[in-house]
Amino acid sequence: MYSACAVALRAGARRVVRRVPKSARALPRAAAARRQISTTAARSTDLTTRGMIVQTLSSVGSKREVQQYLSLFTSVSSQRFAVIKVGGAILTDYLDELCAALKFLYTVGLYPVIVHGAGPQLNRLLEDAGVEPQFEEGIRVTDAKTLRVARDLFLQENLKLVNKLEEMGVHAQPLTTGMFRADYLNKEKWGLVGKVTGVNKQAIETAISNGYLPILTSMAETDDGQILNVNADVAAAELARALEPLKVVYLSEKGGLFDAGGQKISAINLDEEYEHLMSQAWVKYGTRLKIKEIKELLDTLPRTTSVAIIHPEELQKELFTDSGAGTLIRRGSKLQASTSLSEFKDLEALKSVLIRDREGPDAKETVEKYLDFLKENPFKAYFDSSMNALAIVLPASEGRQATLATLTITKSGWLTNIADNIFTALKKEHPSLVWTVKEDDENLGWFFDKADGSITRQGDVMFWYGIENGDEIVKLMKDFTENGRAMLGNSNLESRLRQAASKPAAQQVRGYSTLARRPALPKFSISNRRGYLTQTNPNPPVGKQNASMDRPARVALIGARGYTGQELIRLIDSHPNMELHHVSSRELAGKKLEGYNKQEVIYENLSPEDVRDMEKRGEIDCWVMALPNGVCKPFVEAVWEGRKASGHKSVIIDLSADYRFDNKWTYGLPELVQRSNIIQATQIANPGCYATAAQLGISPLVPHLGGMPHVFGVSGYSGAGTKPSPKNDVENLTNNIIPYSLTGHIHEREVSSQLGAEIAFMPHVAVWFRGIHHTISIPLNKSMTSRDIRQLYQDRYAGEKLVKVVGEAPSVKNIGGKHGVEIGGFEVDKSGRRVVICATIDNLLKGAATQCLQNMNLALGYAEYEGIPTM
């Protein structure tokens, strides 16, 4: 149904630029020629260096994200890339981080214009000189003595920044005089304070064209040569008005704006949210002033310009990822609505909008007929003033749900976030809605986020939200299964266009995802945390679309004494939809369960007979077996016996190795095992900790194996359990590392079985408490580069919230307490036919308890990551 707007979407409220096609990923030198100012040999960027930096930047996001932003940023003249305002505190406390970030930008050929202040330093100098700083309405009162101190200080701070950049190989040019023309703001009130009347753009353009980053101070001069003090925020705003950059960045120690609950605000779309925000009691003081000033600035700039408030350590993430890291503020766009074609001022323009990006020789004629259809039928259209986005909804009628009949959005429409605005309006006016999307639509992940359920039929996906009646959902699914888009009849423009372009083809039913407890899921490719499609992960997370359970799940934990049991108790305690009803431990029976706060729970010593009877009565939704290897069989058989007697089917999750090789059990590694299988499962074998990290570290390269991978694994001593042994004796482990089971370890067999390829595994235990590090040597069947291999991993794990692909080799000390796996290193030998990859995992979390909870969420019908802090 939807036009192929190949874009990437920004997290939640943010949507960004078009995804870079494969042919454009190299970012050829020709990109530089598109710039509006000349470049010289001094500033030409070596593509090898550029590629290396792209790879490094990919540690904060995917390579695609980095390249798409580079493509966007280099599509404008260099001085229009970004204006970055640097506060005095940043120069004092975060100079190294700032310069490192600027070096990245410089190396990839991006030249931001930097303007800095030095307010905190000036206050200290004045106090040391016995001068008390004076402010009126937040503006510094500046007399001759203050100005003299300020001028010397600003020159000193400017030189400090320039010298630091030069030390790092970044050519920087201090532009400290003649950059801002100004008049007195109010000489009687503020003294030597300026109101900027002009900006010397030529000096900035010359510096950049000669390969230098321009570094400006916030000092201005009158036509008579009098120096005036200007607030750095004001100077940055005036620079932005003169240069009209894509980005205006305010570097801040806080890293963004925060709401009443102390949560960082990810994005503000001023056209839709400004009045509401300014009416909120918590929007006051500096926050209120900042939002007001930014609105005044953006009102004078192109709609594509945005303002980011960000910490200097996160500058790359803000600029080069969909998610960003600080607070993004943009104008957005207000929507208009029409219920009749006569309300459109220009029908020809409407036709052009409906036909754009639509293929087919008869598209124009089909659109004409569609407009005739709209003349005779009720509809409501939602669009912005520039028609960058248009949605048409046919209202609900007897026996039919409201239908989103067509939606078309341009690149500019995504850039200005109109897609989210439209769906917000739709949900306000239409309690339930049905729509269809092509399965290869690059925005499919975004549509999943907007929907409650979906069903797939050869190349098409039907989505819906707000339909509560199960019979209606079943009827809808059946209709779509039998008829596809044709079920929507003449209301669906894409269906008309398809019919006009080709004869109907026989279609077969594929998998579907619904709000049923254990639906079979379609094989879609949804990317990570910010809701955009990557089309590379064959088994993407299902997210909140899996949520169907309408009550808390009742959980029984058998064997709660160990480290894993304790971690799982903590996770369930913070889970909004799970309750621990029973915990069983022979040693702790009769004692109060500590660390669980939802209700008082007393340890029991449950027998298999107790378990059987509880299953018969249907008291438990999920049994978690946290017992040593070889112990849980009587309890599992008791659950089976209870099932036979009652028909009640709870979920069993076994944390031991007892059933990992039993094909009657589902292996619970959601990132590699089809999630639809886990959703349907009633008995799940939780993978081992070593095995999880090893499989994730090897799996993307299985088709490229040229021999047996070797895994050198080292675990903290918590992996040896609580029962005393040499492997968890800290004194024995101090200054020591203990190898064990160097051949034939159960995890060696487990990984080999799951990957379908033999591996060699050599486990060791070390003196730290938790965390595993794998060094994996993988022979390849062809020559490959480090960059290619890393991209392979990024593509395979796109969208996974518990797998993080990084550039450098990950470290154990950074994985402790985290709920996922980090994979990095990607060192290739000189032949190109062997790669060494490193992986880390917290053996008690993603290696055990977190993995268990992830499987519980899927099998019980909750959002996959509910209750799990993601990476």
Swiss-Prot record:
The active site is at 689. Its EC number is 1.2.1.38, 2.7.2.8. GO terms for biological process: arginine biosynthetic process via ornithine; L-arginine biosynthetic process; regulation of DNA-templated transcription. It is found in: Mitochondrion. GO terms for molecular function: acetylglutamate kinase activity; ATP binding; N-acetyl-gamma-glutamyl-phosphate reductase activity; NAD binding; NADP+ binding. In the N-terminal section; belongs to the acetylglutamate kinase family. Pathway: Amino-acid biosynthesis; L-arginine biosynthesis; N(2)-acetyl-L-ornithine from L-glutamate: step 2/4; Amino-acid biosynthesis; L-arginine biosynthesis; N(2)-acetyl-L-ornithine from L-glutamate: step 3/4. Pfam families: AA_kinase (PF00696), NAT (PF04768), Semialdhyde_dh (PF01118), Semialdhyde_dhC_1 (PF22698). The protein precursor is cleaved into the two biologically active enzymes, the kinase and the reductase. Residues 1-44 form a transit peptide. SUPFAM superfamilies: Carbamate kinase-like, Glyceraldehyde-3-phosphate dehydrogenase-like, C-terminal domain, NAD(P)-binding Rossmann-fold domains. NCBIfam families: argB, argC. Residues 336-488 form the N-acetyltransferase domain. It comes from the Eukaryota. It catalyses: N-acetyl-L-glutamate 5-semialdehyde + phosphate + NADP(+) = N-acetyl-L-glutamyl 5-phosphate + NADPH + H(+); N-acetyl-L-glutamate + ATP = N-acetyl-L-glutamyl 5-phosphate + ADP. The keyword Transit peptide applies. GO terms for cellular component: mitochondrial matrix. The keyword Ribosomal protein does not apply. The lineage of its organism: Eukaryota, Fungi, Dikarya, Ascomycota, Pezizomycotina. Keywords: Amino-acid biosynthesis, Arginine biosynthesis, ATP-binding, Kinase, Mitochondrion, Multifunctional enzyme, NADP, Nucleotide-binding, Oxidoreductase, Transferase, Transit peptide. Gene3D superfamilies: 3.40.630.30, Acetylglutamate kinase-like, Dihydrodipicolinate Reductase, domain 2, NAD(P)-binding Rossmann-like Domain. This is Protein arg-6, mitochondrial.
